[in-house]
Structures are given as C-alpha cells and as structure tokens.
A protein has these predicted regions:
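N-terminal transmembrane alpha-helices
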Residues: 8-45, 59-74, 78, 103-110, ...
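Transmembrane alpha-helix boundary and packing residues in multipass membrane permease domains
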Residues: 24, 28, 40, 77, ...
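Short alpha-helical transmembrane segments in multi-pass integral membrane proteins
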Residues: 1-21, 79-144, 188-243, 299-368, ...
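Helix-terminus/linker motif at the lipid-water interface of multi-pass membrane proteins
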Residues: 29, 33-52, 121-128, 184-191, ...
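Short runs within selected transmembrane alpha-helices of multi-pass transporters and secretion channels
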Residues: 72, 140-159, 167-175, 196-209, ...
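Small-residue-rich hydrophobic transmembrane alpha-helices
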Residues: 51-111, 148-167, 273-337, 373-395
Length: 453
C-alpha cells in the first residue's frame, strides 16, 4: 500500500493536472456506477414509486453531504499550501486540527439532519405515496454522516498531498462492495430503499478505512499527541477556509430544494424522470469535479511555493482540457443517453414512456450547455486554491438566486418544461462571476517576485 504523494510545484502543468485528475475520474466512474446501480436496482426491483422516493431525497442528501464536503475541501486548501511550502510542523498541525473539526461538525450535522428531515419533506410537498419511503431512506443515510465525513477528510488530505491514486482505489473498493450489498439487501432480502441506504453507508465505511490506512503510512503527517493541541488559532484558520465553502454548498442545495419543491408539484412520474436524469448528472459533472480537485491542489501547492507563473499556466491548461472533455461527454449523452435512462425504470409501458420523455429532454438540455459547468468548476477551484473562499461563496449565492428565480417563474410562462433551464441559468451566472474574479485576482501576482528561475 503506497503513499503516492505528488509535488506539483515542478514539471509540466498540463501533465500534472491530467495525471492527478485521471485516477480521480476513474474512481468516480466506479462511484457513479454504484450510484447508478442503487437507482437501477431500486427502480427495476422495487418500482417507479421507490425510484421517486429516492429521488425526492436527492437534494437533502446533497445538502447534508455538501456541508461536510465543503468543510473538508476548505481544510485541505491550507494543508496543500503548507505541503507546497515545505512547512512540516504546520502541515501536521493542520491535519490534526482538520480531524478534530471534522469529527465535531459531523456529530452536529447528524443531530440536526435527523431531527429536521420529516418537517423538511412535508415543507417540500413530497408526494404522499412516497414520503414514508423517502424519510426511511434519508434517516439511514444521515445516520452514516460521521462515516461519510471521515472518508471526505481523509480523501481531501490525500488529494492535498498530490495523492489521487489512493482515493481511486478507495472508491473502486466501495463501488464493488456497494453493488454486491445492493443486490443482497434489495434483490435478495427485499429491504427496498432501506437496503440501498445501508449498502451505501457500509461501502463508504470501507473507503474511509482504506484512506486512513494510507494516511498512517505518510511520514510527513505522522501525528504526535501535541499536534492536536499546538496552535489553537489553526482551527480558526481552517474554519475561515472551510465555512464559506460549506455555506456555498448549503446555498446551492437550498436552490436545488426549491427546484425539488416545484417538481414535486408535477407528480411522481415527473419526479421519477428527474431522478433518472439526476443520476446521470454525476457522469456529466464527473470530470469537472476532478479537474477542479486537481487545480485546487496544483494552485495551492504552487501558491505555497510562490510559483505564480505556474499557477496561470496550470489554470489555462486545465481550462482547455475541461472544455474538450465536456464536449466529448455531451456527445455521448446525446447519442446514447435515452438508452441508459431506460435502465432506471420499470412498470407500465405508458408510465415508462412518460418518465423517459421527461428524463431525456432534461438530459439533452444539460448536455448541450455542459461546457459552462466545466468552466465553473475550473475557475472556482483555482480561486479556492488561491486561498479565497468568499468569492466561491458569492458564486453559490448567484447560483441560488438564478436557480430559484427560474424554477419559480419560468414554468408559469412556458409550462413544466421551464424547470429544465434552472440548472443552466444557475451555472451561467456563477461561471461569469468566477471567471471575472479570477482574472482580477491573478493580476496581483503578475509583477510579484517569485521563487521560479
């Protein structure tokens, strides 16, 4: 079991970014595979209502997990900067404090989410025929928040050190375990949506354990007891980086919940169609997320090393690769998307036709405008790597305002199809803000003295 840290302050920027991102993308293919397997098994074995029940909880899951993802991603920014600067004592302290803060926050998030879930589902007008199943699914997922938080912080620290191979292995192991447990719990034991939720949490536990074992082998972050107590102010620095990203994800999630509120009013078949497409959304967004992780690590390490010209070169290379990748994925979804969507549904032929019509129309629109989402991830990640998490927070607010406005108003003017454009408009508003902000921020490093030769 290797440690595979990677110093990104020397070498070809484009090569470093792509070799860092590819293992993460491969890992996410497995992750999306088991997410899709969840949906396929539930949809095919249990039926359309169960599929709608899982889908009705999607944005609530995204909200809770987004808090932990944002916090841990923010923590990893400081870790990558200390690693790039070669400040080993500060690096160890940042890792130790990240563990403590993540554990405390996961307990708080667990308590709040379990207590609020039923009331939120009622507020969202979740269809009566699926609300009980949705609540069961969510309560089980939320019970696993500390496990999921552990995986997030362990994987975030590995990425900050330039190690993208170990998260790939962890996600691959989780995918295999999850699919196997899905088949056992849902298809054999007949546990329905509860079985799917339990399988997901157990699989995440295995991935967290693997990442922890890798971290324990890395000499630079072998923690001593005093690392957890030194520099109390370090916790505040971590929170200043992590909190805006968590709030950003909360704001984006609330916008998504507003969309879910509107969709719920269109009936459970519409919910099922949206659910099928949202499961493919992970594939659409997959490469963007991991180009983003690569760029955050790359920018953070080079900022710590004061190699500012490399930052500009790396972001430029990342932009080209991201746009080309988005065009390829869009073409694939347009060509074979409907066939993939058909794997998620079973039931009466007329129901299947309606669900697929809704799902493919939404998928087609997202595929056409996917390049905007990829630009959003590249520039948001670059800004985060520079240590600025307030501008990404502002972009989250822009997403929220646009997503909610379009979701509430456009369906009134052009009918149900108006809801399809909420995501596109949200991406566009955030991407414009982020690109302009990056151009302004990077200028201050233009004439700065660097450590580059």
């Amino acid at each position: 079991m290797g440690t595979n840290e990677k110093n990104m302050t020397a070498g070809s920027p484009g090569k470093l970014i792509i070799t860092f991102a590819i293992p993460l993308m491969l890992g996410n293919i497995f992750q999306q595979f088991y997410t899709m397997a969840d949906t396929m098994i539930v949809g095919q074995v249990v039926g359309v209502e169960a599929l709608a029940a899982v889908g009705a909880g999607d944005w609530l899951v995204w909200l809770v997990l987004g808090i932990m993802t944002g916090i841990t991603q923010g923590f990893s920014i400081l870790v990558s900067q200390y690693y790039g600067a070669g400040e080993k004592e500060n690096l160890k302290c940042a890792v130790a404090k990240s563990y403590i803060m993540t554990a405390l926050l996961s307990v708080i998030v667990l308590a709040v989410s379990e207590g609020a879930v039923y009331h939120v589902l009622l507020f969202l007008q979740t269809p009566d025929n699926v609300i009980d199943l949705t609540m069961l699914y969510l309560r089980l997922i939320f019970a696993g928040v500390p496990i999921i938080a552990a995986y997030n912080i362990f994987a975030a620290i590995l990425r900050a050190l330039g190690n993208s191979r170990s998260p790939l292995i962890a996600m691959t192991v989780a995918a295999v375990i999850n699919v196997g447990l899905d088949l056992l719990f849902v298809a054999v034991f007949g546990w329905g949506v509860a079985g799917a939720a339990i399988a997901t949490v157990i699989a995440q536990g295995f991935s967290a354990l693997y990442c922890l074992l890798v971290l324990r082998k890395i000499r630079d972050i072998r923690l001593e007891k005093e690392d957890f107590y030194r520099q109390p102010s370090m916790s505040l620095r971590l929170l200043k980086l992590g909190t805006p990203l968590a709030i950003q994800n909360v704001i984006i999630s609330v916008g998504g919940l507003t969309v879910q509120y509107v969709i719920n009013g269109f009936g459970f078949l519409f919910v099922a169609g949206f659910t099928a497409t949202n499961k493919l959304y992970g594939i659409l967004e997959m490469a963007a997320v991991f180009y983003g992780y690569a760029i955050t690590t790359y920018v953070g390490q080079n900022l710590g090393a004061k190699k500012y010209q490399r930052i500009r070169k790396g972001v430029r290379s990342g932009t080209y690769m991201a746009v080309l990748t988005s065009v390829f994925i869009s073409g694939m979804m347009v060509l074979i998307g409907r066939n993939i969507l058909s794997l998620f549904v079973s039931g009466e032929p007329e129901q299947i036709r309606q669900v697929l019509d809704i799902a493919y129309k939404y998928l087609f629109i997202m595929a056409v405008f996917l390049w905007i989402l990829y630009l959003l991830h590249v520039y948001r990640s670059a800004i985060q790597g520079l240590g600025n998490t307030l501008i990404p927070l502002a972009s989250g607010i822009a997403e929220f305002v646009m997503r909610v406005s379009v979701a509430l108003l456009l369906p009134k003017w052009i009918g149900e199809e108006g809801i399809y454009y909420a995501e596109i408009c949200a991406w566009s508003s955030a991407a414009v803000l982020l690109i302009i902000s990056y151009m302004i921020l990077i200028r201050k490093y233009k004439d700065a003295k660097t450590s580059e030769s």
